[in-house]
Amino acid sequence: TTEVWGSSDKLKHYVNKYHPDYVFVCLGANELFVRDIITKRSRYVDNMLNQIGNIPYVWIGPPNWKKDTGINRLIASKAKPGCFFLSDGMKFDRSKDGAHPTRKSSALWMDSVARWVVLHSAHPIRLKTPMPGNAKANRVEVLQPKR
């Protein structure tokens, strides 16, 4: 959540460790129904964006399955112009829990994000379509907010 990541300096730790050229953030789905979210979460979003600093970034909004209480509005108001991708309004096939997009739907979601980054983001990057059967990461490291 923005609260977990934004109440620590772990994002800055990862920035210093990996020296990324570009940062993608995808948080907020567990905060769709937080009441008074702007008051409760603004400082955490601010802290995360301060830790990213001047590195180009895109914050990918949550894949809403119901109307949220303001998480998308909060992130959009804090992110620099062209750095927030609004996922709300997209149609997703959902897993059995009714909330998480299926793997296939998640892949289509990220395809939409990729097209948007190339054409509309504040920091477009060149992306090549992966060859079928070759669309697997060589290495995956899950970054956790707690030490």
Predicted regions and their residues:
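Contiguous hydrophobic segments
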Residues: 34-48, 91-103
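Hydrophobic/aromatic residues located in beta-strands of well-ordered beta-sheets
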Residues: 23, 56-57
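Conserved SGNH/GDSL esterase-like catalytic core that processes O-acyl groups on lipids
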Residues: 1-43, 64-70
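Short, conserved loop/helix-junction motifs that constitute active-site signature segments
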Residues: 17-18, 49-54
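Extracytoplasmic/secreted envelope proteins and their assembly/folding machinery
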Residues: 8-12, 42-49, 72, 76, ...
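Extracellular serine-dependent O-acyl
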Residues: 57-61, 68-99, 104-144
